[in-house]
Amino acid sequence: MNIVILAAGTGKRMRSALPKVLHPLAGRPLLSHVIDTARALAPSRLVVVIGHGAEQVRAAVAAPDVQFAVQEQQLGTGHAVRQALPLLDPSQPTLVLYGDVPLTRTATLKRLADAATDARYGVLTVTLDDPTGYGRIVRDQAGCVTRIVEQKDASPDELRIDEINTGIVVAPTAQLSMWLGALGNDNAQGEYYLTDVVEQAIEAGFEIVTTQPDDGWETLGVNSKAQLAELERIHQRNLADALLAAGVTLADPARIDVRGTLACGRDVSIDVNCVFEGDVTLADGVTIGANCVIRHAAIAAGARVDAFSHLDGATVGANAVVGPYARLRPGAVLAADAHVGNFVEVKNATLGQGSKANHLTYLGDADIGARVNVGAGTITCNYDGANKFRTVIEDDVFVGSDTQFVAPVRVGRGVTVAAGTTVWKDVAADMLVLNDKTQTAKSGYVRPVKKKS
């Protein structure tokens, strides 16, 4: 089967410089969702028709299995499909999809394709309570489809029809090519409508078959930011329902956003207002607190991420604790039972098994061993304005509060670092390191008093 995806429209009502089909749904372009659905049908040819913002669209979805046809002028859906014909296999039927209709299920399309075998012309229709704005399916008294009429060209009687055309069709390609070549544009829009092919197919003796999706939202398209927001909520609720069915506990299914792939083990619990981006894995027994953002991360069994924490490109070990208000940046690796607490930032650094940094700390470009206690206010000074350097802290080190490690520096196993110390030289194992300081107390000091105006 050939699949053609129409993605050339300008999307004026989006009021955006970004081509409509590149606006994100669940963190990915609308068009990418449609391409993924098409791929699931294993087409022999997959062609995307581009026009407005053509090079931007091409760059966003380019792949070895995707071919592109260009519609230089947007002269209607029939004209758009015509641009793809040279790239199609004429011996295979062609399925036409739309780059701004992202939620159609693969099973729905397969059902349509199966119904349209043996030289039938298949149309996906849906019945709406309010069909305003859509082309109507006109049938004769026997229930056979006789034509599809667009809203602007419909008579008052036709406007009362509630079965509408979704635009998604399957047709025999060789005949489709002939029918498209014979299309005219004598209509209110002055465009070449793909829907007008139906009358030609009927005249040629082809049976018009229709199928409907299981859910009306499968055929909803995007023409405005309001419609995009509506589809986002529908899609996110579908994802939430799938998580619930898999045994994940969601504090509120309406308040989770998945913008990528979220894989969960058993007994995972997710509180409200959490966002998951990219590929995220939550193993058995993981708990995610409220208002967390987790991107491209793997969190091992029994770990806990407390509220308002941000994880990006991080790996969290079994039974580790993160947050609240912690930030793990790319390259952060927490071993089993490690703790990273409030207002701690970890970047391109490892924190060994059972090690803890519970308060107000920056650990960047560091290798920290097991059972290390990092006191509040500790900073690894890893950047000299041009280059990054690493700090190495071996097992069983105790770091007092308000400590700075000026990299490159290595602190040996079992070292104790006194509070307020700046460490700029390597320290051998089991040493106490501190900076000599004097403390002076003066009597008779009078604190300045602000003058009253």
Curated annotation (Swiss-Prot):
Record key words, sorted: Acyltransferase, Cell shape, Cell wall biogenesis/degradation, Cytoplasm, Magnesium, Metal-binding, Multifunctional enzyme, Nucleotidyltransferase, Peptidoglycan synthesis, Repeat, Transferase
Annotated stretches, region: Pyrophosphorylase: 1-225
Keyword Thylakoid: no
Cofactor(s) this protein requires: Mg(2+)
A GO MF term: glucosamine-1-phosphate N-acetyltransferase activity
Residues binding Mg(2+): D100, N223
Entry's cofactor comment: Binds 1 Mg(2+) ion per subunit.
Binding sites annotated in the UniProt record for acetyl-CoA: A376, N382, Y383, S401, A419
Listed EC numbers: 2.7.7.23, 2.3.1.157
Location of the region described as Linker in the Swiss-Prot/TrEMBL record: 226-246
Keyword set includes Cell inner membrane: no
Region feature N-acetyltransferase, mapped onto this chain: 247-453
GO cellular component: cytoplasm; membrane
Pathway entry: Nucleotide-sugar biosynthesis; UDP-N-acetyl-alpha-D-glucosamine biosynthesis; N-acetyl-alpha-D-glucosamine 1-phosphate from alpha-D-glucosamine 6-phosphate (route II): step 2/2; Nucleotide-sugar biosynthesis; UDP-N-acetyl-alpha-D-glucosamine biosynthesis; UDP-N-acetyl-alpha-D-glucosamine from N-acetyl-alpha-D-glucosamine 1-phosphate: step 1/1; Bacterial outer membrane biogenesis; LPS lipid A biosynthesis
Subunit relationships: Homotrimer.
Family designation: In the N-terminal section; belongs to the N-acetylglucosamine-1-phosphate uridyltransferase family. In the C-terminal section; belongs to the transferase hexapeptide repeat family.
Function as written in the Swiss-Prot or TrEMBL entry: Catalyzes the last two sequential reactions in the de novo biosynthetic pathway for UDP-N-acetylglucosamine (UDP-GlcNAc). The C-terminal domain catalyzes the transfer of acetyl group from acetyl coenzyme A to glucosamine-1-phosphate (GlcN-1-P) to produce N-acetylglucosamine-1-phosphate (GlcNAc-1-P), which is converted into UDP-GlcNAc by the transfer of uridine 5-monophosphate (from uridine 5-triphosphate), a reaction catalyzed by the N-terminal domain.
Name of the protein in its database record: Bifunctional protein GlmU
Gene coding for it: glmU
